[in-house]
A protein has these predicted regions:
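Extended, compositionally biased repeat/scaffold regions that form elongated interaction surfaces
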Residues: 1-136
Length: 136
């Protein structure tokens, strides 16, 4: 079990809230970004962004780049470089942020992430079969 801030986890919601159904999750210790699609499947990608790269990797909106609506840093680089990801996820309404506290519990079929932010706790179940669920 991983507990606390020693394993930073970032989150970005995509689409229109408050009932978001697509996310990007960044696991700092793994340098992986998990993309949670609206069809309840997920894929992971290596986070290759670093401080020497632009904060905004692309700007398909033809407006001055800002976040929101554009994802930035590692989320933005992935959003810009993976084919069809922009169409599948859309843009963001809120700036990416780190979970204030995280608990990650691995189990035989996958893992459960608890993300504590402000007065909200969200639980994400990432299954080894490539499916995910937001537990309420």
């Amino acid at each position: 079990v991983s507990v606390g801030n020693n394993d930073p986890v970032g989150i970005n919601e995509f689409g229109v809230g408050p009932d978001y159904n697509r996310f990007m999750l960044w696991f700092g210790s793994e340098q992986q970004i998990y993309v949670l699609f609206p069809d309840q499947t997920w894929q992971s990608y290596r986070d290759t962004w670093d401080e020497s790269q632009p904060e905004f990797s692309c700007n398909p909106l033809n407006a001055p780049p800002s976040s929101p609506p554009l994802p930035r840093r590692g989320f933005g680089k992935l959003w810009c470089s993976v084919e069809n990801l922009q169409e599948q996820l859309g843009t963001i309404e809120r700036e990416e942020r780190l979970c204030q506290h995280t608990v990650v519990q691995s189990f035989e079929q996958g893992r459960l992430l608890a993300c504590f932010e402000d007065a909200t706790i969200r639980y994400f179940s990432l299954m080894n079969d490539g499916t995910w669920e937001l537990l309420r």
